[in-house]
Amino acid sequence: MSITVRYFASLRERVGRAEDHLEAAGNDTAGGVWSRAVPDQAIPDRVLIAINQEYADADHPVGDGDEVAFFPPVTGG
Amino acid sequence: MPISLHPEAFDPWALLGEYQSRLPAGGFGATAVFVGTMRDFNEGDDVRAMTLEHYPGMTEKHLQDITTEARKRWDLDDCLIAHRVGPIEPGDPIVLTAVWSAHRKAAFEACRYLMEELKHRAPFWKQETLKDGATRWVEKNTEG
């Protein structure tokens, strides 16, 4: 098992890939996952975060097997 | 199926008619409908095409959640959301929300609710292709 990290839309282009896989560290948060997965870029100000497809804050815990997604404000409809 | 994503062009009016024909006749007295269609202009620029990206799984789940919440807030007979994904062109329908209820108040209010919640929460992203072929991501929704 590991943590799946996904990026969408303009954030995917900015990061340069759609997905990462990280080993769970045991005390991960969503914001911490970003820092480990994208160490060369600060987490964007207006980023939205989803853990297992539910919206979450940056300080929300992340466990082994979780999917964490980062994306810009949504613009559907 | 009250939630659907359409990778190809879809006809909201046909979908609406077909869906309504399966609802119990005489059970509802009001149908409220919103259809969003792609414009060929945005932010002062000519727009030639657009690509709608989504988050498979999360998008459907949140559309489903929005309909469930609407049915808790208002006394509705049924509701429907259809949304286009992938490459689209000006004039193409993007989104359909529809609500059936006994009376117009719940129908109008719930239809607006479905659309506004979709705009705020459902993970879709628009990338526009401008006249000169350049692409840009739409950064925020219009005020309404």
Annotate each language-model stretch with its function.
Chain A
Residues 1-76:
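Ubiquitin-like/PB1-type beta-grasp interaction modules and other compact soluble beta-rich domains
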